[in-house]
Structure formats: structure tokens, C-alpha cells
Amino acid sequence: MHDANIKRYCADSVQLWTGGSRGLLTRESASRVKVITENHISSQRQGYICSDNIHVLHDNPFDVAKRHIGSGKTAVVHFLDPKDISGGCMAGRASRQAVMCARSNMYPCMDSANVREGFVTYSKYQFHSYDSDRLVYIPAVTVYRDAMLNVMQEKDWFSVDMIAAPVPYMPGGQSSEAYFNAKVLMAVYKSRFKNIFEAALSESVNNIVFDDMGCDENMCPPALIAIALREAIKEGGYAGMFWQIICAVDEPYSQCMTGKMSIAGRFEDAFFRTETSREYIRRMESMPYTPPKETLEIIDGPILGDASRIERFVRWRAGNRYFGKQFSILGDGISTLAGFNPPGYEVYYTGDNCNKCGVYHMKDTWWGRLIDYYGGHLLVNNSWKGSMVTYDRCGSRKDYSAGCSKERTIHLHVGSVEPDVIIIYMGINDWKQGAYAERPMYDRVSEGLAEELIFDSAANIMVDRISRRYPRAEIWKCGLIGTYVRSDPSFRLSKNKNGINWCKYNGGYYRAGHFANVAFNEPIPGYYSIDGIHPNVEGMQKFAKMVVHGFDYLFEPERFAKYIDEKYDIVEDLDYDQYCKVLNEDVQNRYEQTKPYSYLT
């Protein structure tokens, strides 16, 4: 819906429902608002004999609720962005949440310290974009406008309870590049639906009305949400605990992007079919796949114009042991990308840095190429710009940003979905800041330092915490490598300000547990960078290639030759401060000048 008056309508609602006698009604409702935590279990288990009480309607949830008010306590379930409970209505954004705020006093009822602290602020500190299962129960929300936003006669106003649930945004979804992981979304929605039903039971709700559940603005596949809801109802036995369970998932502006079928039509079709969540996930994984150029660039040899070899790669990919597996990343700024990292984390690849490096999409990054190469799925990218494996001795960074911290090592999963592979690439900032690579002998300064301040000890703590929390996951530890820039490849960066070579830090990784160590055994290891550390798009390609070579689980291994870069005469190693002074700022990004490939014949 696009309405230039949405801001005025919402402002009118706030003014109408915060003053006078109507303000008393709002404050009374707000005083009874509850924040319901995750994994809520109701002590009430009401039972009804209902043979046909689940419906999918092409209608507005408020209007559906109005028709059922006389037949028991009714609640409308609304999925919203917990970081903006107004839905942008005060800024004039025409979202579903904004429309509901314009039609009722829902926003003034939710605008309380209890909700801001226990729901809004809490959501800002989640470690992934799917958010939590926390809910807000809002009693007696008054609806006074109709679906066309016209003020109804006061005798037609009505009150209905509401349950606000966080919409699970897909990674990259808020930066226009949504990444779809069917297994994760299915698990997240099922868990959220169960918490909603338990909350409704605790409040003695008889009729429960769902809105679009996030498949409108979030554009999550309606079929997936329908299957998740159906299985949640079946597993919890909720069909016999409510008089009516209604899905009102269609409004005039809730249309499929293709225009072929409404969201409600696709939802209804999937809801009343027999396809299970496992069958749906398998069907998604078996969809036709065309490898992007960025993935094919990992493979040695002339493959971009070789259709038969591309076909062989697609078959190998579908049968390799990592196909369909869940990958999590633990890294620093090199592994960040706008929209793909936890809320509140500092990100390097965003805005102007993306323009400088030519890294805009997941398929441009080293980890995106690698995951697609093996046919896996991104689970969590827990990467933070500037973070180190160790605690910061200087105190300029909080301890919880360190790779060895408990906060980062236990947040590599989403709900019930655990990682199959965890890839660690960190340490460049430890090297840059001059952290102790190992505890030196006869050094009084280092004698009293905590283990978390010494790199090899911190790396061991990090890997140990990860392996204890995720005992079934493979852990791939990537060693540090040098870098160079295309404008002057003779400059090599390998020593920090204390004169310590980055190779010293790799020793700490290799001693940290018996897990897969990805060693870069290249003749001239390194990648193209924009500033001596952060790779540009060509550097991302080389980096992904080196990880695959280092892990040595390859497509057509007999045809893989070690990636031999051009030979350069290496000048004396420079420390980071010297390097920054002599760095040629006129770095040309060859990616922007290269014509698109036509790799399929």
C-alpha cells in the first residue's frame, strides 16, 4: 500500500489515543501489556471438539477478528520489526505495521518502558537477523478506522487483543539481498509459532487470527510458512485447544511479485497439501542450479566457456560431502558484509568501501564463494570489523568482541539449527596491534598477563569453547597470509610494528586443537587488497581459491595445479605504519573495468 497520508493518519492516532478519556483507555491497556519470553509453556490446556476449525481467508485480520469477537476471546497475531514497533508510520512509510498503527491505538499501547527494554532493546542484541521468539501481548487494542483508513462511527469501534511477534528477517534482507536458508527459516518459524500458541493459551484466547506472518514485506516464501504453521499445530496438538485458528494473509497490497497468484493463494495451496518440512527442504535443494561466475573462478583451468565441465562440476557439487551442510563464519572485518552480520557489529564492507573494493554481494566475498562451491548454506556470519582473537591490552575494544570470548564462540547457531562446519579466519588485527604471539620467556611484562591476552593461548581457548559448544561441527582454522596491492605488487606486508612476522601467529592456530588447519602453501601466498589488509573482489577470488586448495577437497583434483601467481621481486618487508605511508592510494579496481563473462555456451 502506498498512501501519502499514512504519516498524518498515524499522528492523528497518537494524538487521539494519548489524551483525555481515550488516553485513559490506552494507559489502562498499556499497563497490562506483557513481554513473553522464549520457550514459554502454558499451564492451561483447554480442549474443544472441533472438526473444521482451521481456515485460510483472503481478508483483513482486524476485520476477521471483529466477526469472531462475540464467540469468545479473540487475538490477532501480527509479525513486526521489533526495532521499529511503529512500522515507520511516523516517517510516512506505508508498511503493514504502519497501517495497523493508523487503524488503532496499538502503537501508544506498545510505547512503554517495559516493551522498549524487554522487546525492542533485547532484539537489538541478537546474534543473527532472525531475531528471537519473544512476544508482546497487548490486551484491548481499540480499532477505530476501517480497511480504507476511514474513521468509523464510534458505535462500530471494537477492541481486540494482539500478539506482536518479531518477523524473522533473512540475512541481507534489509539491504535488498535476502539470503534464503530453508532449514533455518523452517525451524525459526516453527519455534515462533509454538511460542505464540503457548502465549495465547496462557491468556485464555479462544480464537486466534494470524496476519501474513512475514511473507509480505519480508517476502519469505508463503509455502514455507504454511508448512511450518501446519507442523507446529500438529506437533503441539493446538487444533483441539482453540475454537478457531484463522490465517488472514491477504490484503489488496499483499500480492505475489510475479502477479500470478496472491500470497494467500500460495499459502492456502501449501497449507492443505501433505508436503512435510523435510520434503520441502529437499525440494529446494534439488532445484536447478546454475553456478555463478564467482564460484567457477575458484576452479583452475578454462571452465568459464566449457559447458561440459560446468555440468560435471554441478554433478560433483550435488554429491560432495558438504552439499546441504550449514556453514558458520567466525571472523573480523575481512569476512563482513552489510546485512549479513549480527546487529550492532561493526562492518567493513559497506557503503563507500564496497565501491572501492567491488565487493557488493555475498557471491563476491571469499566465504560466499566457498559456501556456494560446496553447495552449503550460510548459517551465521559472526564477523566483526577490527576484532581480535585476544582481548585488547590497550582497552580500546570491549572483551566481548574478542574471538575467544564466550559471547562470540557460543553464537554460531540459529535456534535448533547447529553448524556442520565452522570456518575461522581471524588474527590479522592481533598481528597489526602487536599482540604477543606466544608468552615470551624472561619477560616481566607478559608474566602477569591473562591467557586471553596471549595469541596462542587465546586461540586455544577459542577453539576449545567452540568445540565444546558444537561437538559435531568440523572446525576449519585458516592461517594468516600476506597481502599486496595491484598498483605496486612489489610491496609485501608481513611484519607488524614490533617486527613480528604473521607466520608466528599461525603457530598458535596449528597448536590449538586437532582440527582441520587450512594452510596456504602457495609459492607467493597473498591476495590483492585495497589497503594492505582488506581484499578487493580479486583478492576475494584468490582467497577463496586458497582456502579450497588448503583444505584439499576439490572438484577434479587431478586437474588442479597449485595457484602460481606472477613472479615479483620482493622488497624489504614493511611494518604496517610504514606501509600506510607509502601505500599508493591510486588503487585501480580491475573488476570495474572487466566486461561481464559469458560462461555458458
Give the ranges of each region predicted by the language model.
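Active-site segments of SGNH/GDSL-like serine hydrolases
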Residues: 425-432, 460-496
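Structural recognition of the beta-strand scaffold that forms the well-ordered cores
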Residues: 76-78, 162, 209, 326-330, ...
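Conserved SGNH/GDSL esterase-like catalytic core that processes O-acyl groups on lipids
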Residues: 337-440, 444, 448, 486, ...
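Catalytic His-Asp segment of secreted/periplasmic serine-dependent ester chemistry enzymes
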Residues: 480-601
